[in-house]
């Protein structure tokens, strides 16, 4: 199809529904595996749908980042590393680093100095499909070719620490990256609701950034309108600025690696250690 046959909201419903169905239905799960394999091998109909998924997703990401005044020089997806995967896998085999284990291809990365178990890094499934580690390694190959970085810094969910430890070790063991090149993992925690669990909507779904910004702006707007000293339009425009401060300061004022509770009521307060209070204080200084 020329136009995307779905919206970002529909995609957000399809993905968890398909994930849940694959856990309960083995036949469906196998069909999903086969579809993934065909997609990775370039099957045109699946690639066309995938292109629409990418376009819709990236457009939504760019819109949300624009709301936060955040820009990126490059927008690179996991699939950008795909052309490098075949040669990289062959290189791992030729160097004797990758070997078969239960039909899959793995690279041993454990070291004598390890204080905990580091499992082998799985780089190809038994059906020939690629995994996250495969793409991450191929991405490093691409970055070495294009940028030759002095160091790598990965800012990712802290729960991915083991994964990237494996990837970094394979990259250095295979000579993709020089042994003395720093490869740093900076893990961050999750933003949780008052119940201590990852933020969700009132309906129980995953909280989208766009929805979170809307709720924060509305909370700030209601606080501004309590004094009834400004027009509704002024209150809305002010709420957008103050709401952004509440979100950014609420997030950045916590230790990056720790999970924390994002309490909208507290973080939108004009009192205490909050973004709105800092803006309020700044406005008084300039009076």
Regions found by a protein language model. Give the residues of each.
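NTP-dependent nucleotidyl-transfer catalytic core
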Residues: 1-285
């Amino acid at each position: 199809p020329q136009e995307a046959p779905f919206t970002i909201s529909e995609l957000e419903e399809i993905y968890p529904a398909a994930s849940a169905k694959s856990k309960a239905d083995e036949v469906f799960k196998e069909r999903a595996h086969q579809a993934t394999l065909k997609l990775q091998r370039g099957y045109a109909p699946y690639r066309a749908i995938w292109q629409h998924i990418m376009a819709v997703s990236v457009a939504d990401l760019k819109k949300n980042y624009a709301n936060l005044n955040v820009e990126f020089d490059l927008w690179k997806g996991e699939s950008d590393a795909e052309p490098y995967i075949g040669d990289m896998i062959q290189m791992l085999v030729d160097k004797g680093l990758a070997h078969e284990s239960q039909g899959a291809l793995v690279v041993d990365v454990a070291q004598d100095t390890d204080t905990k178990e580091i499992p082998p890094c799985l780089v190809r499934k038994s059906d020939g499909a690629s995994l996250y580690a495969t793409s991450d390694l191929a991405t490093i190959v691409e970055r070495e070719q294009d940028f030759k970085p002095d160091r790598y810094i990965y800012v990712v969910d802290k729960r991915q620490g083991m994964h990237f430890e494996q990837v970094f070790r394979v990259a250095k063991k295979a000579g993709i990256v020089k042994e003395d090149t720093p490869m740093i993992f900076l893990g961050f925690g999750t933003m949780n609701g008052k119940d201590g669990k990852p933020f969700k909507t009132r309906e129980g779904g995953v909280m989208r950034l766009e929805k979170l910004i809307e709720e924060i702006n509305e909370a700030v707007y209601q606080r501004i309108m309590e004094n009834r000293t400004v027009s509704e339009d002024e209150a809305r425009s002010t709420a957008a600025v103050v709401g952004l401060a509440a979100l950014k300061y609420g997030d950045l004022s916590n230790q990056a690696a720790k999970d924390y509770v994002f309490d909208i009521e507290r973080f939108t307060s004009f009192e205490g250690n909050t973004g709105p209070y800092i803006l309020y204080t700044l406005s008084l200084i300039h009076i």
